[in-house]
Amino acid sequence: MQNEEGQMVDLYVPRKCSATNRIITAKDHASVQINIGHVDENGLYDGRFTTFALSGFIRAQGDADSALDRLWQKRKAEVKQQ
């Protein structure tokens, strides 16, 4: 829902799992949100980060590590990270 100024005013905006595109419900207490920091060519953090959300379903199956690796390899090419 938007107000007259075009700002989002919803009380709850559900997140989606980055790996499966499933909606992460409010009762999914096993879900996590992970920020991965970007580094420069010297290996120093440059203030940027990428956020990934993983549902409890992916974590319960034991696929979180491979899903996060796959997502980061895809995103790394987009942000030109080494």
Swiss-Prot record:
Pfam family, any one: Ribosomal_S21e
Molecular function in Gene Ontology: structural constituent of ribosome
Keywords (A to Z) from UniProt: Ribonucleoprotein, Ribosomal protein
InterPro entries: Ribosomal_eS21, Ribosomal_eS21_CS, Ribosomal_eS21_sf
Domain of life assignment: Eukaryota
BP GO annotations: endonucleolytic cleavage in ITS1 to separate SSU-rRNA from 5.8S rRNA and LSU-rRNA from tricistronic rRNA transcript (SSU-rRNA, 5.8S rRNA, LSU-rRNA); endonucleolytic cleavage to generate mature 3'-end of SSU-rRNA from (SSU-rRNA, 5.8S rRNA, LSU-rRNA); translation
One of the record's GO cellular component terms: cytosolic small ribosomal subunit
Family under the similarity heading: Belongs to the eukaryotic ribosomal protein eS21 family.
PANTHER family on file: 40S RIBOSOMAL PROTEIN S21
Protein name: Small ribosomal subunit protein eS21
